[in-house]
Design a protein with these regions (language model features):
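Non-cofactor substrate-recognition interfaces
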Residues: 1-4, 10-294
Length: 294
């Protein structure tokens, strides 16, 4: 039995620690054959998205079993690690509920890699799911990708961590690979071969890929270098503005806004959704942050 999850960033799949389903989405079980290996499979996906993967031309080659579940009914089910290179240091590989999961595209099941996405980190923390970290030689937890944009090489990791947590035979082929060609100084950005493609080929051979295709979508790029941006966990300084949120909302009501809708609308809504303020954002063109202690 397989969960059919969808992603536009295959390079984050080795860091997967959860799958998210929607709270109000219905899911069904489909018996079919894998299109790449022709092996029999049973998959779970959103009922609304079945026609996107099982067309009328395919009738007779698949069967919707009739079993169905709402998203929360799948919560807590455990699954096998998709790419077992690194053991997580905590609870992982469970189905969780994510409030941002939709059926606008994909399969209605979202792959969660807490170390490479703010939403992923948020829902994983709420569900008690551990992120997948490595430990470097300094003893610090690090995501699988280093700050140069490549999978950590084994020599930069803590030997004891490597011994106990990494399947070296499986990982060594990909250690040191850049997740985006734009980061690799030795190859051109327009080279056809990418890490994403190589991972897709690997998953095909392992009967773990169901549909692989090119997908055009927006992606953030650095305005100075024109290179793709990675969402990455970094040490930062924060001001705990959430501790004063309720007080600021009260005080906002005493302000005579002109027009009044600014205070109750744009600014008021901003206060209601206030998060802790990150004041030490890391940029390669940044300047030192002055801090005064009183």
């Amino acid at each position: 039995l397989y969960f059919l999850a969808w992603t536009t960033t295959p390079w984050t799949l080795p860091s997967n620690t959860a799958l998210a389903v929607g709270p109000a989405i219905e899911y069904v079980k489909v018996k079919c054959r894998n299109p790449y290996t022709d092996r029999p499979q049973t998959v779970i996906l959103a009922k609304e998205l079945v026609p996107a993967y099982f067309t009328k031309k395919m009738e007779g080659t698949y069967e919707i079993t009739g079993e169905s579940w709402q998203g929360p009914e799948l919560e807590g089910i455990r699954y096998e690690q998709l790419i077992p290179w690194v053991k997580p240091m905590g609870d992982a590989f469970r189905v969780i509920v994510g409030d941002y999961v939709t059926t606008s595209d994909g399969t209605g099941i979202v792959h969660i890699a807490p170390t490479f996405g703010a939403d992923d980190d948020r829902v994983a923390k709420a569900a008690g799911i551990a992120p997948l970290f490595m430990v470097d030689k300094a003893g610090k937890n690090q995501p699988m990708v280093d700050k140069q944009g490549k999978f950590f090489v084994l020599e930069d990791l803590d030997p004891e961590f490597v011994k106990n947590n990494i399947d070296v035979e499986k990982y060594k082929e990909y250690a040191g690979r850049y997740v985006k060609n734009a980061y690799d100084p030795e190859i051109a950005c327009d080279v056809e071969t990418t890490l994403d493609i190589d991972l897709a080929v690997m998953l095909k051979a392992q009967n773990k890929a169901f549909k692989i295709e090119k997908h055009t979508h927006s992606y953030p790029h650095c305005w100075r270098t024109d290179k793709p941006v990675l969402y990455y966990p970094l040490d930062s300084w924060f001001i705990r503005t959430t501790a004063l949120r309720e007080r600021m909302i009260e005080l906002n009501k005493t302000i005579r806004w002109k027009p009044e809708s600014t205070g109750t609308g744009r600014f008021g809504k901003w206060l209601e959704g206030l998060v802790d303020w990150n004041l030490s954002r890391s940029r390669f063109w940044g300047t030192p942050l002055p801090v005064w202690a009183t």
